A protein has these predicted regions:
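Phosphate-binding and adjacent anionic-ligand microenvironments
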Residues: 1-174
């Protein structure tokens, strides 16, 4: 319905690219099934979820339900008469690496000029084939550094560089 899927900012780039290729809009929210559900209700969307596996079918429930998700997936497999592997071939998952950096002041990290310059440099280097996210945890005194790229090696290289800059700026708690 509404040809839109609701997903969080942490969803894999492969999802965004696959949806675009299929002509499906993606409404992006902050992390948390609460925010996914809020966007679904506010806009009349019927399907959304987050990378952690919380998949919401608003016609049936307001929270993620693993059994419901499995049943809905089985319905698609039977309807399309294709294996799950065949159905998934159209989506390339990008390698992704996430590191948590313990900090005293999350806002200071996000607002730090050198951190932002390095983030922009990495983003430019990755281009259309990757991305970097710096996100304040909502539950812990950490900054989450996430990189998606064409290879695990590139993910590690850029995550390590970003963490190094945060440490060099004296923002990390060792």
């Amino acid at each position: 319905q509404n040809n839109t899927v609701v997903a969080t900012i942490m969803s894999n780039m492969g999802l965004f690219k696959a949806m675009k290729r299929e002509g499906i809009e993606v409404c992006v929210t902050t992390v948390g099934d609460k925010y996914v559900n809020e966007a679904m209700v506010a806009n009349g969307y019927v399907f959304g979820g987050e990378q952690s596996g919380h998949i919401i079918f608003s016609k049936h429930a307001t929270t993620g339900d693993g059994i419901l998700t499995a049943l809905m997936l089985m319905e698609v497999i039977l309807e399309k008469k294709q294996s799950l592997g065949t159905l998934c071939k159209g989506m390339q998952m990008y390698p992704q690496l996430l590191k948590n950096v313990r900090v005293e002041d999350k806002a200071a990290v996000i607002g730090n000029a050198r951190v932002q310059v390095e983030k922009d440099r990495i983003s430019t280097a990755l281009g259309e084939d990757g991305r970097i996210l710096l996100r304040e945890s909502g539950t812990e005194p950490v900054i989450r550094v996430m990189v998606e790229a064409q290879s695990d090696e590139l993910c590690a290289k850029y995550v390590d560089k970003m963490v190094q800059v945060i440490r060099e700026e004296g923002l990390a708690v060792e």
